[in-house]
Design a protein with these regions (language model features):
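Acidic, low-complexity terminal tails and accessory targeting/binding regions
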Residues: 55-58, 64-106, 115-262
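Alpha-helical interaction elements in eukaryotic regulators
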Residues: 28, 37-40, 48, 67-70, ...
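Long, low-complexity, polar/charged, intrinsically disordered or flexibly structured peripheral segments
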Residues: 13-36, 40
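Active-site-adjacent bridging/hinge elements
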Residues: 31-52, 82, 86-90
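Short beta-strand scaffold positions
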Residues: 111-112
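Short, hydrophobic/proline-enriched secondary-structure or compact coil segments at domain edges
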Residues: 5-6, 16-21, 170-171
Length: 262
């Protein structure tokens, strides 16, 4: 028998810890949970936090781009306008058909995965629930925790309400109000509300632009969404390189990948 490499050991351990969680949700109890210590669970939790922030969150080069399609649809629902683009990751055929993409409903419900919710939060610039996490040591005082942001049955709710003739929007994450602030183009308020006009304008000005969607389409990513090389015909100017190096939501090793590819 050959000894398992550390990477393989971590993979098996992670799957078994995950089985503990899934079986507990399904059956109410799991014997797999007895195999692990409190430290094991804490490390597993941090590994998930790091994965979600570096692949789908603000530490990811493509985090905002991955959530852009839904946010564009959300923006058109808020404005009650048919989808006209710019087209990114949406289903254009369905979104152009008001039967499948109505804009006059009092309530909308979308169902998706935890990773998609995280990319949506990133595109919406919800830095209130984000962190710059270390890949070398566990930060026990971090504010971002996957188990709190996108747990089983996570819910992200947007409420539009009329207060004294002015429309406001409020965000609730898993039943807790997340106060909107300057990261969403809003004036800070004790009740967490934001004027709808200000919120819409900020999305119009920043969601597509800040995602770097067109720019990222010239790059090739690996399974972890790390930039590895340019697509055939892709060109990066010096200005592009400078812009990417200043990106607040990139991996710190990305520039090395790109320069090596060029």
């Amino acid at each position: 028998h050959y000894p398992l490499r550390r990477q393989r050991q971590m993979c098996i351990r992670d799957r078994m810890v995950s089985l503990c969680a899934y079986e507990t949700v399904s059956q109410g109890y799991s014997d797999f949970c007895k195999l692990f210590t409190k430290k094991d669970f804490e490390e597993f939790s941090y590994e998930n936090d790091l994965k979600f922030q570096t692949v789908f969150g603000f530490m990811s080069t493509g985090g905002k781009a991955m959530g852009l399609g839904w946010v564009q649809e959300f923006l058109h629902r808020l404005k009650k306008e048919p989808m006209k683009g710019p087209w990114t990751t949406q289903n254009k055929k369905l979104d152009e058909d008001e039967t499948y993409f109505p804009i006059d409903q009092p309530i909308y419900a979308d169902f998706t995965h935890d990773a998609v919710i995280q990319t949506i939060l990133t595109t919406l610039n919800m830095r209130q629930v984000a962190d710059e996490l270390s890949g070398f040591h566990m930060d026990e005082n971090r504010k971002y925790r996957t188990s709190r942001v996108v747990p089983f049955g996570a819910r992200l709710v947007f409420e539009v309400m009329d207060c004294d003739g002015t429309d406001y929007i409020r965000v609730k994450m898993n039943d807790a109000v997340v106060p909107l602030d300057e990261n969403q183009g809003c004036e800070r308020r004790p009740n967490g509300l934001c004027q709808l006009d200000s919120y819409i304008k900020h999305l119009e000005d920043h969601a597509y632009h800040d995602s770097n969607y067109d720019f990222l389409c010239t790059l090739k990513l690996n399974e972890n969404f790390d930039l590895t090389k340019l697509l055939e015909g892709g060109i990066l100017s010096n200005d592009d390189l400078k812009a990417l190096s200043k990106s607040p939501y990139k991996h710190h090793s990305r520039m090395e990948h790109i320069r090596r590819a060029m």
